[in-house]
Curated annotation (Swiss-Prot):
Residues 415-610 form the B30.2/SPRY domain. InterPro entries: B30.2/SPRY, B30.2/SPRY_sf, Bbox_C, Butyrophylin_SPRY, Chromo-like_dom_sf, Chromo/chromo_shadow_dom, ConA-like_dom_sf, PRY. Transmembrane segments: none annotated. Zn(2+) binds at residues 225, 228, 247, 253. GO terms for cellular component: cytoplasm; nucleus. Keywords: Coiled coil, Developmental protein, DNA-binding, Metal-binding, Nucleus, Phosphoprotein, Transcription, Transcription regulation, Zinc, Zinc-finger. Signal peptide: none annotated. A zinc finger (RING-type) spans 146-186. Residues 295-374 form a coiled coil. Residues 21-75 form the Tudor-knot domain. One of its GO terms (molecular function) is ubiquitin protein ligase activity. This is Nuclear factor 7, ovary. GO terms for biological process: innate immune response.
Length: 610
């Protein structure tokens, strides 16, 4: 039983050796494979991994390299066992190696001073306790030091992750930020909130009242100047480096500008804030534009699908019409061909019947002619000859006429495409609308033809009654027919004119005084000036680049679709398209413009189907 108990005590002792103590320092394996001394700052239990983890600070390294590690990365060693020394052992260590002989009396040994092993052991333990207390005091002092200002805590507060800072220090760090994080562990913090740590405040006050000791003056290697071994308190604005007071006064930093670390943090945080603010505004604009661009892309894809469906539908109508006409024409060809073939085949049958009858008569006549018996030859010879003559007359009366029937070339071998095009024009939607001009809207300098199909500019004003529809200053005239639904297409002949306007106007658009022609004012139009300068009258106007000079302009209106398109009607190439939502009736409008020193005297003329 005693041996078992001894084994249990040994196991317990081994477990105690392998325990990890907060505030102690152990060698720790870093993620890069190197090994470095690390202070154990705090512990936590990872429920997901099912293990204890330790938050370590690598001695002499930047606090940003602090991390959570598990026990396997700590190098834990079992301390050597203390061996108690008795008086005999002490004697062996202090006495000369000379062995007493057997004759040496026991009295001499007793007269020698007794060693004091227990006292020495107590002194060793006191020294150990002193060192331990110094280490603990150093760790305690470090725990009472703000990691930002590296001074004892003043009005300490604890943030959500559990780290503590001076209230003024954390306020300076978080000032002007839109998102927050712990300066120690970089953990994100949702709200700018912290809790007053009264316990830590009391401890810091007590530490401040304690006489200064070497432990209290201890600074971590990270916060010391590598050159002068002094605390880093200043920031050099010229070199962008941290320094101590000696650095500031050295020749290396002569005439350099220094700031206290916290002031430098505030200055550069303000600079970053000045950079971040416009960037955040730009980000907001970019995000908005990105969303709008996504909407545009989505709408574009919808338009592609809709346009594809429209094109397919329009061509299906054409295909259907042409297919029906093709089938009808082929049916006519078959019917006419079959009828002619039947006539010729019937004629051939008659010819073959006559041929057989003639062959039979010839055969009988030759057979009678070869008869050698005179009596047999002459018997009923007249009757036989009459039958032969009757057969001859029958053949002659029937007649062997060769029939040569021809298909109608004009129908089946004529200009089929042109014929189909002429028929197609009657079913095309929209077809060419025959437009007329409204004389009640014409400017007094415009002269309309008797048929109201053309207009030209006249130097002399006509005496016309004024009315709300008439243009008083702009040289324009409306069409007499307006559109408030459906799809429509019309054309105007512009010929070799050097200036003109062609477009659409809303019913309520202004007709009096000087008018700005654009969609906002109810006008959708294109114009030509100086013989080669084309524009779409948008707001602002847009210059148009045409590859050829159109002699006819086509205008297409899809009222429900909100579309007004202009074409070069000579080859149906698109010139420009307006998109809008129409709420009232639209009327065509024309302007032949001024004479331009005799270069622009021709009239504008609506095109009608011939």
């Amino acid at each position: 039983m005693e041996e078992d108990e001894g084994a249990d005590d040994g196991e317990q002792e081994e477990e105690e050796v392998l325990l990890v103590n907060v505030g102690s320092t152990y060698p720790c394996k870093r993620s890069d494979g190197s090994q470095h001394d690390a202070d154990i700052v705090k512990t936590r239990y990872n429920k997901q991994a099912g293990r204890e983890e330790y938050y370590v600070h690598y001695v002499g390294l930047n606090r940003r390299q602090n991390e959570w590690v598990d026990k396997s990365r700590l190098v834990l060693t079992k301390p050597p066992k203390e061996v108690e020394t008795n008086g005999t052992d002490q004697e062996e260590m202090t006495e000369p190696t000379e062995q007493p002989d057997s004759k040496t009396p026991q009295k001499r040994k007793l007269e020698e001073p007794e060693p004091e092993p227990k006292k020495a052991k107590v002194e060793d333990k006191d020294a150990s306790k002193t060192a331990a207390s110094l280490g603990a005091a150093g760790d305690f002092a470090e725990e009472l030091t703000c990691p930002l200002c590296v001074e004892l805590f003043k009005d300490p507060v604890m943030v959500a992750c559990g780290h503590n800072f001076c209230r003024s220090c954390i306020d300076k760090v978080w000032e002007g930020q839109s998102s927050f994080a712990c300066p120690e562990c970089k953990e994100s913090i949702t709200d700018r909130k912290y809790t007053i740590n009264r316990v830590l405040a009391n401890l810091a006050k007590k530490a401040a009242c304690t006489p200064v000791t070497p432990v209290e003056k201890k600074t971590r290697p990270l916060e010391k100047c590598s050159e002068h071994d002094e605390r880093l308190k200043l920031y050099c604005k010229d070199d962008g480096t941290l320094g101590c007071v000696i650095c500031r006064d050295s020749l290396k930093h002569a005439s350099h500008n220094f700031l206290p670390i916290l002031d430098a943090i505030g200055v550069y945080r303000e600079e970053l804030s000045a950079i971040v603010a416009p960037l955040e505004a730009s980000l907001k604009v970019t995000e908005q534009l990105s969303g709008e661009q996504s909407d545009k892309i989505e709408q574009h894809n919808k338009n592609v699908s809709q346009y594809k469906e429209h094109v397919t539908s329009e061509f299906e109508k054409l295909h259907k019409f042409l297919k029906e006409r093709e089938e009808k024409l082929l049916e006519q060809l078959k019917e006419q061909g079959d009828n002619l073939l039947t006539e010729m085949e019937n004629n051939l049958v008659k010819m073959q019947e006559n041929q057989d009858a003639i062959k039979k008569t010839i055969s009988l006549a030759k057979e009678r002619m070869e008869e050698t018996d005179s009596i047999s030859f002459l018997t009923d010879i007249k009757t036989f000859i009459d039958k032969c003559q009757e057969q001859q007359r029958a053949v002659i009366s029937t007649g062997n006429t060769l029939l040569s029937k021809e298909l109608c070339q004009g129908t089946f071998k004529g200009p089929i495409q042109y014929i189909m095009w002429k028929e197609l024009k009657s079913v095309i939607t929209p077809s060419l609308t025959p437009m007329l001009l409204d004389p009640n809207s014409a400017h007094p300098n415009l002269h309309l033809s008797d048929g109201l199909t053309s207009v030209r500019y006249g130097e002399n004003k006509l005496s016309l009654p004024d009315n709300p529809k008439r243009f008083s200053q702009c040289i324009l005239v409306l069409g007499s027919q307006g559109f408030d639904s459906g799809r429509h297409y019309w054309e105007v002949e512009v010929g070799d004119k050097t200036a003109w306007d062609v477009g659409m106007a809303s019913e309520s658009s202004n007709r009096k005084g000087k008018i700005k022609l654009n969609p906002k004012n109810g006008y959708w139009a294109i114009w030509l000036r100086n013989g080669n300068r084309y524009k779409a009258l948008e707001s602002p106007s847009k210059a148009l680049s045409l590859t050829s000079h159109p002699r006819k302009i086509g205008v297409y209106v899809d009222y429900e679709g909100g579309q007004i398109s202009f074409y070069n009607a000579d080859n149906m190439t698109i010139i420009y398209t307006f998109s809008a939502t129409f709420t009232e009736k639209l009327y065509p409008y024309l302007s032949p413009f001024l004479h331009d020193s005799g270069k622009n005297v021709d009239a504008l003329r609506f095109v009608h189907n011939q």
